[in-house]
Regions:
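C-terminal-biased regions
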Residues: 35-38, 95, 110
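A solvent-exposed, acidic/Ser-Thr-rich amphipathic alpha-helical stretch
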Residues: 1-56
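Short, surface-exposed coil-to-beta transition loops
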Residues: 35-37, 70-75
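Short beta-strand edge/turn micro-motifs at domain boundaries
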Residues: 51, 72-102
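Extended, polar beta-sheet/loop recognition surfaces of beta-rich domains
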Residues: 101-110
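Short, mixed charged/polar active-site loops
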Residues: 11, 68-70
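Short, surface-exposed beta-strand-loop junctions and turns on beta-sheet-rich folds
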Residues: 58-60, 94-95
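Short, cysteine-centered beta-strand-loop-beta hairpins and adjacent loop/turn segments enriched
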Residues: 59-68
Length: 110
């Protein structure tokens, strides 16, 4: 499996690489993040292989910042069915913007 998050995070391969991405790169970078996907299109090349593309909006707070950030990206995935279960074999992420929202903090309603 491959997870190519792109700059500023990098490319990660295999289960050890995905583990590194989560535990050593993403979780230390983000206090909190929420990912919303939309406009999903799936194309099947045969009964066990497909590709998909979708838009993603992420709102979160970096560990190094107080203000929240917004990220707009596209996920392009290679999907495979193995032993009857669909899995993401490869995810390529194209980040379109990664911006702070000055003066905005993520907080529960008062």
């Amino acid at each position: 499996c491959v997870w190519d998050i792109g700059p500023p995070f990098g490319r990660f391969e295999g289960h050890p690489g995905i583990h590194e991405a989560i535990y050593d790169v993403l979780w230390p970078a983000w206090q909190e993040s929420h990912h919303l996907t939309t406009n999903l299109v799936i194309r099947f090349s045969d009964p066990d292989n497909a590709s998909s593309i979708c838009d993603v909006d992420c709102t979160g707070t970096l560990t190094s910042a107080e203000d929240c950030h917004i990220v707009g990206a596209t996920y392009s995935d290679v999907l495979q069915r193995r032993a009857g279960q669909w899995k993401i074999h490869q995810r390529n992420v194209q980040i379109h913007y990664f911006n702070p929202v000055a003066g905005t903090r993520l907080a529960a309603p008062a």
